[in-house]
Structure formats: C-alpha cells, structure tokens
C-alpha cells in the first residue's frame, strides 16, 4: 500500500492544481469553502487516498514534497520561486555531500531546497542578520524535515573550501570577496537579484576577484492548458522574478 499516514504527519490536501492545503493529520475538522474535511479519517490510511468533505467534494491526500513546503511555508520575505531554484541547483551542481554557504536565509525557502539535496552527508551554512527571520526559518526547516542538515548563523562567513556559495542579498557585490575566500578552487557561485543594477555591480565584482565562467540568466515560466482540440498557453505566466548570476572560482596565481 505504500507509506501510511500517521497522526501528526503532514498531508497536502489536493483539490485542484490551484487549490492545495498543507495540514497535519490530527483528530480535528478542517474547514474549506468546499465543506469540512475530517482530518482524523486520514490516520492509518495510505498517501494518495481520496476523501470527501461534508459537501461531497473529493480531495486527494498527497505526501508533501520540498516544493510544497516552499510554497506553503510561513513568509516574511519574498521567496525565490521554484523555477529559479531549479536553475540554481543544476548550475551549481549541489548534491549529496555538498557543503554550501547561503547568505540571506530569509524564511528558509532556498535553504530548505539546498538542505534537501545535500542530504544525507552534506551541510548548509546559512547566514541571516535578522534574528526574527532565523526563528521563522528554523521552524520552516523543522517542518520540512531538513533542519538537521542546516547551521543557521547571523554574522560573518567562517567556512572555507566549500562547494558552493549562494547569495540572496540586497548588495551581493559586497560579499563577492568573502565568497571567493570561502570557495574551493573551481567552486560554484550564484546570486539572485531582482534588479539589473544589482546584477551589473555583482558581475563587475566577480570579474575583479578572480571568478570565471560568469553568466547571467532569467527564467520565464509559462503553463500550458491542455485540452483535446483546444490546447493553448495559459493567460497568465510567471514572468520576471529576478536575474541569476553564476560563476566559478579560478585560483589566483
């Protein structure tokens, strides 16, 4: 039957692709605009089970993945969207065993994804100067099940010989020298910036500090409405969210 839902487990109630609800399997009622779902009825049943609300509307109980936690986590800052997160993971080569420095934890969206991919032997060292966001990020990481792979810090970059440094800051160009010092030779650098002015300053700093293979990309995501005989692009799309700059560390002789 697969993985059974235990009391206290997270469940993603799927109504349709625009309406999903991250809940815990507890002995209580969950109220929606489509009726009441008795969450206790999920306990002991398998993920993927279909349940009906008091109004007779069907929900599917799915096991949340890292994308669901990113979208549903408590926020206090703008998060990096999954379309951009995917590019960052591929371009930086982060995987099991990687040691990664992140600057700009925010509420932990990128941190959660990094921690998910460095498991089980890797480590994420995440820096955030605002204590209130560290607390929120810690709770979000705990719920996503990846807290043990992350060290949350609030000052300085102390690490060295890391595989990747990833920045989500207002002034990333100021951190470029520290990123260079922290990286191993050939290590990966990535920086997410919403404006082109930030990006220009960051690229200039990268060139001045021995980085190579510098490139900046923007990812636009358009959904497709698939219906037999009338397939078409969605009216709305996820357009500009930011510019992502990548680079590699070249050793200075």
Specify the residue positions occupied by each region the protein language model found.
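Core SAM-dependent methyltransferase catalytic element
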Residues: 207-212, 220-253
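Conserved class I S-adenosyl-L-methionine
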Residues: 95-106, 165
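N-terminal auxiliary segments of SAM/dcSAM-dependent transferases
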Residues: 1-63
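S-adenosyl-L-methionine
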Residues: 127-172
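Conserved beta-strand signature within the Rossmann-like core of class I S-adenosyl-L-methionine
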Residues: 186-194, 198
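A short glycine-rich, Lys/Arg-flanked "PGG" loop and its adjoining helix->strand segment in the class I
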Residues: 115-116, 173-187, 207
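Helix-to-beta-strand junctions that scaffold the AdoMet/dcAdoMet cofactor pocket
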Residues: 95, 118-119, 146, 183-187
